[in-house]
Amino acid sequence: MTDHDERTFVMVKPDGVQRGLIGDIVTRLETKGLKMVGGKFMRIDEELAHEHYAEHEDKPFFDGLVSFITSGPVFAMVWEGADATRQVRQLMGATDAQDAAPGTIRGDYGNDLGHNLIHGSDHEDEGANEREIALFFDDDELVDWDRDASAWVYEDLADHD
């Protein structure tokens, strides 16, 4: 990982898994120039769901969130790249799929607010990436590796410091 890279947590939710969209979503993230450093196909139990959505615990939709995220398998991932969190959020599109722009994951594949296919760490919450990554992955499950194409995707950011 370079000084300019960051890691971000991304999850294909049960609706995206059931609709067979894991490959399409991974392809979009890779095509953007991001690099997967961890991936796990798994089921989320209620305890993990409560931890993951703890900030929504007092909201009226909390029980529905927990019920949905535990309803089927998910594909949890960690991605790395320059400004990775912001890039993922842009690719995802608006939270409500009906408001998401065409060309975004939710705009192209999503149906509504409750079935919006994908979760990504909040770019406005500085601790969200580390917290979510640690919740779903042990350090030894993340792989440091160099992609030979990085020089073809990003200009040398060191020249701009």
Curated annotation (Swiss-Prot):
Cellular component, GO, one term: cytoplasm
Location within or outside the cell: Cytoplasm
Catalytic center residues: H119 (pros-phosphohistidine intermediate)
Cofactors named for this entry: Mg(2+)
Domain of life from the UniProt record: Archaea
Gene Ontology biological process terms in this record: CTP biosynthetic process; GTP biosynthetic process; UTP biosynthetic process
Cystine pairings recorded for this chain: none
Residue ranges that the Swiss-Prot or TrEMBL entry lists as coiled coil: none
SMART domains for the chain: NDK
Molecular function GO terms recorded: ATP binding; metal ion binding; nucleoside diphosphate kinase activity
Reaction catalysis annotation: a 2'-deoxyribonucleoside 5'-diphosphate + ATP = a 2'-deoxyribonucleoside 5'-triphosphate + ADP; a ribonucleoside 5'-diphosphate + ATP = a ribonucleoside 5'-triphosphate + ADP
E.C. no: 2.7.4.6
Principal location listed in the UniProt entry: cytoplasm
Keywords, in A-Z order: ATP-binding, Cytoplasm, Kinase, Magnesium, Metal-binding, Nucleotide metabolism, Nucleotide-binding, Phosphoprotein, Transferase
Enzyme class name: transferase
Transmembrane segments: none
Residues where ATP binds: K13, F61, R89, T95, R106, N116
Protein family (similarity comment): Belongs to the NDK family.
Main function: Major role in the synthesis of nucleoside triphosphates other than ATP. The ATP gamma phosphate is transferred to the NDP beta phosphate via a ping-pong mechanism, using a phosphorylated active-site intermediate.
This protein's name: Nucleoside diphosphate kinase
Lineage: Archaea, Methanobacteriati, Methanobacteriota, Stenosarchaea group, Halobacteria
